[in-house]
Design a protein with these regions (language model features):
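Non-catalytic beta/alpha edge segments that cap or flank active sites
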Residues: 1-171
Length: 171
């Protein structure tokens, strides 16, 4: 198998208040910036789309289902906590064909050692359709922490996802 000629990335922000215009979404653009930097450093062609939706189960499910055949990477931000409107994990998990628990567990443990509240995040990662999906918390600080760790493994994850054995010396 081959890597895509151009990576398509979708960043979905879930926030009732940002969707209503009560404040500006900063987390989605923060993810976009980190992905842009990563893709450029790898010399990969890419496009990134942003979506801002309310914390709505039907809307998130419809968006992920329609995006998973089209996008290579999907990132969500928001809705991974334990509040009554935090619905991301409940919607995304049933859509996964494979879950990748290690990366999110590692992030929670690493940052939770200093900030126990970080252990309340329920973010998950996995494969849905033709996409890798990562569900991140909604704060800009948490996005930065999560992206730092995700990007350390993303190239290898993409190679594995596309059936390329990066351990072979000829590749």
């Amino acid at each position: 198998m081959n890597l895509p000629a151009k990576y398509r990335v979708l960043v979905i922000t879930l926030s009732d208040r940002a969707h209503r215009g009560e404040y500006e979404d900063l987390s989605g653009p923060a993810i976009r910036q980190r992905i842009e930097e990563f893709m450029k450093s790898e010399g990969w062609e890419f496009s990134i789309d942003l979506a801002l939706i309310p914390d709505d189960t039907a809307e998130l499910e419809k968006l992920v289902k329609s995006a998973s055949p089209v996008y290579d990477l999907i990132f969500t931000t928001g809705g991974t906590g334990i509040g009554p409107r935090d619905i991301t994990v409940e919607i995304v998990r049933p859509l996964l064909s494979k879950e990748i628990p290690g990366i999110m567990e590692y992030i929670r443990v690493k940052y939770g050692a200093e900030k126990p509240n970080a252990l309340l995040s329920r973010g998950i990662a996995g494969i849905t359709g033709k996409s890798l999906i990562y569900t991140l918390p909604g704060s800009v600080k948490a996005v930065d922490e999560y992206m730092t760790e995700i990007l350390r493994t993303l190239k290898h994850t993409l190679l594995m996802f596309h059936g390329i054995d990066s351990h072979l010396k000829n590749q």
